[in-house]
Amino acid sequence: MGEIERPRSLSRITVHSDAEYLDAYDHVTYSNSLELLDTIAETQITLNLFMNNKFELAEERMAELYDKSMYHSMGYTCILFIKAVMTVNKQDMEKAAEASKLSCEIIEKFRERRSIKETIFGASAKGKKMTDEELHAELCYAQSLLIRAMLTFFHDDNFASFIKGALNIRTCYQTYRYCEKLMNEPSVWVGRNKKVQEQFESGTRMGLGTFSLMLSVLPSKVLRLLEVVGFSGDKVAGMRDLHHVASMTGTLCSPLAKMVLLTWHLIISFVLGTGQPDLEVCKRLMPGLTHLWPRGAIMLFMKARLLLISGDIEAAIHYFNMSIESQDVYKQFHHGCYWELLFAHGYQRRWSHSANYARLLMKESKWSRCVYTYLLCIFFAADETVEEGRRNETINALAGKVDGLRIRIAGKSIPVEKYCGRKAKRFTTTNSLLFAHYEFIYFWNGFDIFGKNSKMVRGIVEDMDRVWEMKKSTCDIDDYCLYYFLKGVALRHLSLHAQAEECFKIVLERESSIKSFTYLPPNATYELAMLRISEQQFMEAQTLLDKARAYKSYSLENKLHFRIHSAMGTMGCRTPMM
């Protein structure tokens, strides 16, 4: 398959000067002060180091007082956690898990001892007697517990560890709620330094706001069960808290809250919803963060995502490449960019470029070789510039590997890997991967990203029509329905509602004949509902969404349930319990 190369940016934009950005922290003097506000200031400096790609220096700075300061301990554990999640390396996971355990023990020493009764009912009475360190220890403890829980999910894939992680998350949430009681009790803050209060408030609001936001994406059936045990998933309240923290200039959590908001609008709203970000909010938040971290890999990535979603794909490609070139310490940051570049080139039907990035991921990343191999297979199949005999030989070899590369987490198969395995298995019997590349782009919200670019969408419709005319005589009913489903999606984004509806009805009328692609009818029903929402026929839309949700046991079922929940939310409805 030849030597792996990374395609250069195809952008019309002139590349910035190669002069390396020199920030204020290239030459640092460590502070050994253990005063609370000094340790918070050190953590703020470390955050800037990390976000400006000074990863090793940031880790070294936090390790200096790791066993003496709760903020250093929390910061050090957070850095190790990020590294472990990126590398998926067993040694990194074990190191982060051990640091997380020790961090909780260190922070525990700073906490005020209290009974359960005092935790629930006596926040004000107890709080005003607490020292500044004891107050902030509650905050640090909640954060460290969350990291420990997440590491448990990643590190141990058994059911007992899953339960342990869930209990840690519940304790973490309860601790944040206790911090909220302290934050809202005026007597607690009488006579204290204003900065101590502001740092505490920003951390508490950010923790609760992030929790509320993430819980709000869960289907009502799950959320209502969680509410019984004390969780709350109010999206409006979560957004309000995060925007409040973002405005608290000078606090440790202000830039972090801005990053959470950007991540929500630019990534999570697509992964766990219908892709309806508030781009105006993103455009307001971006300048302040790019001023803080102008050449940081993470900020360049976020800027690229904003450009991608705004429709400037060439500029997005340019900034993804800039993110890659900005640092070489954490190679795993590159993999996130490769993933995005794979799709960015796919949107423009540069299949050889997409295949190249899939090949890079398959070679370098440990996250899911099953998915990467499948992507290489389908993009290679779509690339008509490759000689047919060589293409078929490569596709057959790749498709045969996909199912055997699946992994399990907590004893469970990963839904997207199961989907890829089934599609690859079907190829071995039908010799067809017709429109598999467009289908994957659909499931990963590609049409929501480029849907407003009518020229691009029309190009995809023309390409599908051309290929269909060549292949339709040898296609089965599943391929037939997939063609009309994807064409319907494209026509919906072109606002050709009557034609789109006809395509979805063609799929639904043949539901009983579909053998493998049983996920098409529920997704076609959902797409019909989205048509009705755009026509403001909300009652009919809700009926269709309920019907789509009633389907069971098909590939990527949870992904559709998240979309249904998000669509219900746009109409002010909650998904039913049953």
Swiss-Prot record:
Q: Which domain of life is it from?
A: Eukaryota
- Keywords for this entry? Repeat, TPR repeat
Q: State the organism of origin.
A: Caenorhabditis elegans
Report the protein name in the record.
Answer: Tetratricopeptide repeat protein ttc-39B
The record's SUPFAM superfamilies line, in alphabetical order, gives: HCP-like (SSF81901), TPR-like (SSF48452)
Q: Where are the TPR repeats?
A: 297-330, 481-514, 522-554
Which InterPro entries has this protein been placed in?
Iml2/TPR_39 (IPR019412), TPR-like_helical_dom_sf (IPR011990), TPR_rpt (IPR019734)
Q: Which gene encodes it?
A: ttc-39B
Q: Name one Pfam family in it.
A: Iml2-TPR_39
